[in-house]
Amino acid sequence: MTIHIDFLDETNEVTAEQIETIERLLAEAAALENVPDGAEVSVTFVDNERIRAMNRDYRGKDAPTDVLSFALEEEGEEEVHIVGADMPPVLGDIVISIPKAKEQAAAYGHSFMRELGFLAVHGFLHLLGYDHGTEEEERVMFAKQEDILARFGLTR
């Protein structure tokens, strides 16, 4: 099971060790969710100004947020699914605010790595179609997140 992850750190604040941990977390999540071999995802680390602009432009919310996910494989109601010849899926993009992650880690009383891992896994599950719009959806999604994080010792 291999997932290809492209990382871009626009903040120059994320260490190689932290990126490696996120890579392992997302590979574990992909394996647990039976993501096709060779699937691709990008993870970009940004500052609050950049994520605020993205949140405003794409969600109509003019405020910084912690993580945004942009799924590339979603089909609209009138779109037809075209099956490629064994083409691995491009799942989409995850954008994480490093200042927000640091702020939330301090507020929740856990490590920056735990918060960074949580946001990466949270964004990844959104790319796979999970949501938390209802209590039941939230229960399922958050249980999956906690399970994956616990496997790496990233508990609260």
Curated annotation (Swiss-Prot):
Compartment annotation: Cytoplasm
Pfam families: YbeY
Binding site for Zn(2+): 122, 126, 132
Major subcellular location class: cytoplasm
Gene3D superfamilies, per the entry: Metalloproteases ('zincins'), catalytic domain (3.40.390.30)
Gene Ontology CC: cytoplasm
Cofactor: Zn(2+)
Alphabetical UniProt keywords: Cytoplasm, Endonuclease, Hydrolase, Metal-binding, Nuclease, Ribosome biogenesis, rRNA processing, Zinc
Keyword RNA-binding: no
GO molecular function annotation: metalloendopeptidase activity; RNA endonuclease activity; zinc ion binding
EC number(s) given by UniProt: 3.1.-.-
Co-factor: note: Binds 1 zinc ion.
Coiled coil: none
GO terms classed as biological process: rRNA processing
Family statement drawn from the similarity comment of this UniProt entry: Belongs to the endoribonuclease YbeY family.
Stated role: Single strand-specific metallo-endoribonuclease involved in late-stage 70S ribosome quality control and in maturation of the 3' terminus of the 16S rRNA.
HAMAP family cross-referenced by the UniProt entry: Endoribonucl_YbeY
UniProt name for this protein: Endoribonuclease YbeY
Biological source species: Geobacillus kaustophilus (strain HTA426)
Gene name of the record: ybeY
